[in-house]
């Protein structure tokens, strides 16, 4: 089998949805079978490939068609300023991409902002969703145990407002539990992505002013979600509080929670092997 790379899996599609008319979406795609769409987080320089390059191969080998989508205003997708909460607009983009690719139903895997996107999709388009896997998702309002916003979110907005290599390093240090995973290669790749799209950074801040994080809260509607859901969390997450995982398993009718020890906000990357086994086993269950 040919090695999967960002280059040989890179594709584009045009979508037309509310506030996303004639909009270009970039994605990486490989494999055949049931569609699994993976949705990245909201940090500066984020994208589908950088978020999920440790996951795409095992999911393809397990028999899935895997799509790593760049959300609107991120990486190679078109720039955008949003007047509504980002999770909802991103969910429309997922639906639009599925329409463009002829995908009737898909499983969703979402980390952080991508988790908020998946939750909104589950509420707005339930008939298009198979199963849902969430890793430290946003969009759940206040915490009972942690002051909000948490340390990582403060650094994220600082990096958007005043991009610097040192602030990026600080954010990644909070992002991950195991500091030995932080290499100059990792930092340099993320920094290059940040510098490549300055409009994305500006537009994220404008969008956040128009629809602040407080508007993202879908907690009151969790009971509407019928999809089987696997919720995962890093015990040491410093971006989104662990007690939000309990909100999800209490609110969603068919949800289970797995907590990774010695793990930060990027469970699918920091605990990739364990996450891949857990997630693929969950998708295979009937």
From Swiss-Prot:
- Note the InterPro entries from the entry: AB_hydrolase_1 (IPR000073), AB_hydrolase_fold (IPR029058), AB_hydrolase_sf (IPR050266), Epox_hydrolase-like (IPR000639), HOPD_hydrolase_BphD (IPR017727)
For substrate, which residues are the binding ones? 42-43, 51, 111, 180, 190, 266
Give Gene Ontology CC terms: membrane
* Domain of life from the UniProt record: Bacteria
Single Gene Ontology MF annotation: 2-hydroxy-6-oxonona-2,4-dienedioate hydrolase activity
Any idea which residues are catalytic in this one?
Answer: 265
Q: Which reaction does it catalyse?
A: 2,6-dioxo-6-phenylhexa-3-enoate + H2O = 2-oxopent-4-enoate + benzoate + H(+)
Q: Show the coiled coil region(s).
A: none
Q: Where is this site: Transition state stabilizer?
A: 112
List keywords of the entry alphabetically.
Aromatic hydrocarbons catabolism, Hydrolase
Enzyme Commission number: 3.7.1.8
- Tell me, what's a Pfam family for it? Abhydrolase_1
Q: Which pathway does the protein contribute to? A: Xenobiotic degradation; biphenyl degradation; 2-hydroxy-2,4-pentadienoate and benzoate from biphenyl: step 4/4
Biological process according to GO: biphenyl catabolic process
Q: Which family does it belong to?
A: Belongs to the AB hydrolase superfamily. BphD family.
This protein's assembly is summarised as: Homodimer.
Query: What does the protein in this record do?
Result: Catalyzes an unusual C-C bond hydrolysis of 2-hydroxy-6-oxo-6-phenylhexa-2,4-dienoic acid (HOPDA) to produce benzoic acid and 2-hydroxy-2,4-pentadienoic acid (HPD).
Q: What is this protein called?
A: 2-hydroxy-6-oxo-6-phenylhexa-2,4-dienoate hydrolase
Q: Which organism is it from?
A: Comamonas testosteroni
What's the encoding gene here? bphD
């Amino acid at each position: 089998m040919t090695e999967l790379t960002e280059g040989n899996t890179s594709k584009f599609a045009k979508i037309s949805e509310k506030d996303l008319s004639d909009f270009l979406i970039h994605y990486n795609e490989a494999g055949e079978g049931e569609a699994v769409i993976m949705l990245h987080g909201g940090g500066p320089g984020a994208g589908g490939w950088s978020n999920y390059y440790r996951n795409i191969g095992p999911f393809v080998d397990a028999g899935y068609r895997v799509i790593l989508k760049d959300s609107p205003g991120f990486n190679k997708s078109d720039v955008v300023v949003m007047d509504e909460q980002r999770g909802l607009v991103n969910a429309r983009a997922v639906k639009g991409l599925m329409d463009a690719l002829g995908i009737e139903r898909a499983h969703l895997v979402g980390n952080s902002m991508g988790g908020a996107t998946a939750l909104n999709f589950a509420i707005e388009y339930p008939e298009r969703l198979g199963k849902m896997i969430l890793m430290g998702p946003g969009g759940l309002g206040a915490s009972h145990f942690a002051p909000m916003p948490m340390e990582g979110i403060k650094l994220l907005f600082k990096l958007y407002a005043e991009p610097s290599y040192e602030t990026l390093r600080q954010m990644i240090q909070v992002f991950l539990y195991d500091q030995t995973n932080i290499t100059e290669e990792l930092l340099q790749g993320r920094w290059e992505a940040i510098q490549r799209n300055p409009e994305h950074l500006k537009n994220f801040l404008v969008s956040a002013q128009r629809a602040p994080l407080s508007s993202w809260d879908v907690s009151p509607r969790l009971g509407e979600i019928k999809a089987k859901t696997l919720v995962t969390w890093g015990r040491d997450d410093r971006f989104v509080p662990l007690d939000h995982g309990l909100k999800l398993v209490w609110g969603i009718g068919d949800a289970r929670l797995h907590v990774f020890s010695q793990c930060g906000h990027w469970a699918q990357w920091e605990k990739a092997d364990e996450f891949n086994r857990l997630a693929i086993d969950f998708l295979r269950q009937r």
